[in-house]
């Protein structure tokens, strides 16, 4: 069992991986008892983005706050609080903050997707 608060989770800078103005916090994963998946909280600063990329695992996203776009398989999808998305394995995608405040979203991946 595990209960935690986002304010107590360290922020990990994602810019060394090619992102701009991006950080993640690992909320729940194997260390908390969820063996097969990891729930991360991603934050994109104003004008921040993830790199255009793909990988061999899917992920599920839920937007907590802010606005942006998800470019997936050549199509642009608007993001706002309450938006959910499923990104299949091996599909090119990129998250971009287009708003005037941070874009925060949950990203759930299999454990092999958390590096």
What label would you give each PLM region?
Residues 49-51, 69, 85, 89-95:
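Histidine-centered metal-chelating micro-motifs
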Residues 1-36:
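A short, N-terminal "cap"/entry segment at the start of jelly-roll beta-barrel domains
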Residues 41-45, 55-70:
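Short, conserved beta-strand element in jelly-roll/cupin
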Residues 89-114:
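Ligand-binding loop in jelly-roll beta-barrel domains
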């Amino acid at each position: 069992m595990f209960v935690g608060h986002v304010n107590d989770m360290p922020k990990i800078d994602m810019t060394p991986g090619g992102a701009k103005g991006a950080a993640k916090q690992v909320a729940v994963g194997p260390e908390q008892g969820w063996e097969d998946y990891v729930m991360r909280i991603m934050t994109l600063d104003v004008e921040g983005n993830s790199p255009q990329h793909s990988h061999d695992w899917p992920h599920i996203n839920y937007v907590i706050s802010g606005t942006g776009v998800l470019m997936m398989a050549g199509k642009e999808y608007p993001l706002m609080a309450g938006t959910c998305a499923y990104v299949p394995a091996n599909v090119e995608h990129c998250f971009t903050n287009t708003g005037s405040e941070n874009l925060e979203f949950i990203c759930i991946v299999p454990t092999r997707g958390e590096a």
